[in-house]
Amino acid sequence: MCGRTACSLGAARLRRACAYRDRQGRRQQPEWLREGRYRPSYNKGPQSSGPVLLSRKHVQQDADSSERVLMDMRWGLVPSWFKEDDPSKMQFKTSNCRSDTMLSKSSYKGPLLKGKRCVVLADGFYEWQQRGGGKQPYFIYFPQNKKHPAEEEEDSDEEWRGWRLLTMAGIFDCWEPPKGGEPLYTYTIITVDASEDVSFIHHRMPAILDGDEAIEKWLDFAEVPTREAMKLIRPAENIAFHPVSTFVNSVRNDTPECLVPIELGVPKEVKATASSKAMLGWLKSSQEGSPQKKEDTLPRWKSQFIHSPSPKKSSAGILRQWLGQEGGPPAKKQKA
């Protein structure tokens, strides 16, 4: 399953990170719709809003279906046929949608057959491993290149070389209040059986679209029929992960500390270190619109971590570089 994500890039950088090639081979950046509503977060849960990619044709009928737009939508699908005047009155959870049942449930089948496919964007997602009497959170994401995001210029037209966003297959819908009012756009994340590498953490994972060709096929509902698009919904192998502090357990905690790699089996006190202060300084200067915390309000906590076998994949060292955490514990070399 997928019940918590992080998406910390500011709106302008998020747009750059989603650049793609159009049918003529030209680099394009998707236009933001309702950009002012987007709020970056290191700890995003269901019912919060998050960024998604969709075909422009959904909002502009005469548009080319291969064109993409960015929109901020609420996490947890509210079907267009929902009759209550308050979407919070829904009595079932729709933050995740199982791939094996989505064509048998009306909440998902309707929008899916209408081509309402979207790509949910995130730095990565959190998943909890249940072991013994406790749960150990992990952060799961795409393997990263070694270029530091701080080198990226905000208004650069060059290819994005910062953090590679995790791109998850989703379904969206638009609900209109029965008594009138602003339409509500919502989404759900499709889940599949976990790949072998992450099955020790949880038996389910998001359906991850690896590469622009997969993203293009999933979004272009006018050219790629549902049956063909469904072939993209499968477990992903090209992923990395590392354990993180139980600080992330509370959705109220929304700082970079949520992402920082930890070593299992080691009691660790996390506080406002010099490196974390430098990290926050970089985030303030380079990520417009990102969550900002005063240095003296950084959390301080102690956790006893459950010992478990080391993960098979990790880009933890690169994440520390991204967060300015070079002073943290060294990442162990692990099999790819």
From Swiss-Prot:
The record marks 127 as: Required for sensing abasic sites. The keyword Glycoprotein does not apply. Residues 29-38 have a biased composition (Basic and acidic residues). It is found in: Chromosome. The record marks 202 as: Required to stabilize abasic sites. Residues 29-52, 283-336 are annotated as: Disordered. Its main location: nucleus. The modification Thiazolidine linkage to a ring-opened DNA abasic site is found at residue 2. InterPro entries: SRAP (IPR003738), SRAP-like (IPR036590). Pfam families: SRAP. One of its GO terms (biological process) is positive regulation of isotype switching. Keywords: Autocatalytic cleavage, Chromosome, Covalent protein-DNA linkage, DNA damage, DNA-binding, Hydrolase, Lyase, Protease. It comes from the Eukaryota. GO terms for cellular component: replication fork. Its EC number is 4.-.-.-, 3.4.-.-. The active site is at residues 2, 127. Formation and reversal of DNA-protein cross-link depends on DNA context. Catalyzes formation of the thiazolidine linkage in presence of abasic sites in single-stranded DNA. Mediates the reversal of the thiazolidine cross-link in presence of double stranded DNA. One of its GO terms (molecular function) is DNA-(abasic site) binding. The N-terminal catalytic Cys-2 residue forms a thiazolidine linkage to a ring-opened DNA abasic site. Glu-127 catalyzes reversal of the thiazolidine linkage; self-reversal is favoured by duplex DNA formation. Glu-127 is also involved in sensing abasic sites in single-stranded DNA (ssDNA). His-202 stabilizes the abasic sites by forming a hydrogen bond with the O4' hydroxyl group. Sensor of abasic sites in single-stranded DNA (ssDNA) required to preserve genome integrity by promoting error-free repair of abasic sites. Acts as an enzyme that recognizes and binds abasic sites in ssDNA at replication forks and chemically modifies the lesion by forming a covalent cross-link with DNA: forms a stable thiazolidine linkage between a ring-opened abasic site and the alpha-amino and sulfhydryl substituents of its N-terminal catalytic cysteine residue. The HMCES DNA-protein cross-link is then either reversed or degraded. PANTHER family: ABASIC SITE PROCESSING PROTEIN HMCES, DC12-RELATED. Belongs to the SOS response-associated peptidase family. This is Abasic site processing protein HMCES.
